[in-house]
């Protein structure tokens, strides 16, 4: 008699980072082990591809997933898991609601803002570890932010800190995202943010000049957030952050020029260290926190003190 392949023995979670450029899907065990991870270009005209990508990831593992956490690039209603608007993915709003995804996948689904999840991921596993109050700001296709206060993710009914939509040029009504994002950089250089960053680091004069313009706009947005929340640390992420000091130094200079009498607020400005999977790790952390807070949904097969290789409980 042939041995039967092992069936699903533990509950897991499907974590999704839906970006304007990339769609990342991973399946986690309760202990934080990533069993399967897939990355594809976001098919902007095919919102149904999200469900197919999640099903594919599940089919490639032996985990019995019971839940999913999906990070989306825009403000959401945290009460019912409905995206309010996805500026970089117009038309996707109805396809990524918690109610619709739950019905299509037969999973408990939670929707969160992607920058909120990245902030949580950096706070638990990356450059924000060890600090109580932190602002995470990312510049990629768009600009987003997440805020950690007293060690907890901060949001209101309709998300929080939609930094990309702060107006910094009031005469023309232009926002931080209009002027300080990877899209703005691409408009100036003809290259995506990561490529332009590499060229700037290599000394390309056109890329350096474009970065100066974009970095100044981005720094203004970070400056405004720092004076709203007075964090002890600012973590900078996203594709544009690959430029390193070309992006970070303008932020530090602007904060040095105006600190509102608080000499330490926002002075600890660092680059994100969680890598490309930080949004997925934040989604896992959100799910893990939920099952720890609700024993009724805890996986009975996983011990309460299961060690997390990413240091969740550290």
Predicted features by range, described:
Residues 17-21, 138-142, 159:
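A short acidic Gly-Thr/Ser loop motif
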Residues 109-113:
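General beta-strand structural signal in soluble alpha/beta enzymes
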Residues 1-69, 78-82, 101-107, 121-135, ...:
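ATP-binding/phosphotransfer module of carbohydrate and carboxylate kinases, centering on a glycine-rich
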Residues 38-40, 87, 157:
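Short hydrophobic alpha-helix segments
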Residues 82-93:
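A charged helix-plus-loop insertion that forms the helical arch/lid used to bind
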Residues 23-27, 143-148:
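Short beta-strand scaffold segments in enzyme catalytic cores
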Residues 114, 140, 283:
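Active-site glycine-centered loops adjacent to acidic/histidine catalytic or metal-binding residues
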């Amino acid at each position: 008699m042939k041995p039967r392949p092992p069936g699903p023995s533990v509950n897991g979670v499907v974590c999704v980072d839906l970006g304007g450029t990339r769609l990342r899907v991973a399946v986690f065990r309760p202990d934080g082990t990533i069993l399967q991870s897939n990355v594809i270009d976001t098919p902007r005209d095919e919102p149904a591809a999200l469900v197919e990508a999640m099903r594919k990831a599940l089919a490639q593992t032996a985990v019995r997933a019971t839940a999913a956490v999906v990070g989306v690039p825009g403000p959401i209603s945290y009460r019912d898991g409905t995206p309010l608007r996805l500026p970089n993915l117009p038309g996707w709003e109805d396809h990524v609601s918690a109610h619709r995804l739950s019905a299509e996948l037969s999973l408990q689904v939670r929707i969160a803002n992607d920058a909120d999840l990245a902030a949580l991921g950096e706070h638990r596993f990356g450059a924000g570890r060890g600090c109580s109050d932190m602002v995470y700001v990312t510049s990629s296709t768009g600009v987003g932010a997440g805020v950690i206060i007293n060690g907890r993710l901060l949001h209101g009914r309709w998300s929080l800190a939609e930094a990309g939509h702060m107006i910094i040029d009031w005469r023309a009504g232009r926002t931080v995202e209009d002027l300080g994002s990877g899209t703005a950089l691409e408009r100036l250089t003809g290259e995506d943010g990561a490529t332009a960053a590499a060229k700037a680091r290599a000394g390309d004069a056109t890329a350096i000049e474009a970065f100066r313009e974009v970095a100044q706009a981005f720094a203004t947005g970070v400056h405004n957030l720092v004076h709203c929340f007075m964090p002890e640390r600012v973590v900078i992420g996203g594709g544009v952050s690959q430029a390193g000091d070309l992006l970070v130094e303008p932020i530090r200079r602007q904060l040095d020029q105006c600190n509102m009498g608080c000499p330490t607020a926002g002075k600890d400005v660092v680059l994100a260290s969680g890598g490309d999977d930080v949004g997925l790790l934040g989604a896992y952390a959100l799910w893990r926190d939920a099952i720890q807070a609700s024993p009724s949904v805890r996986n009975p097969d996983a011990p309460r003190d299961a060690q997390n290789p990413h240091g969740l409980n550290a």
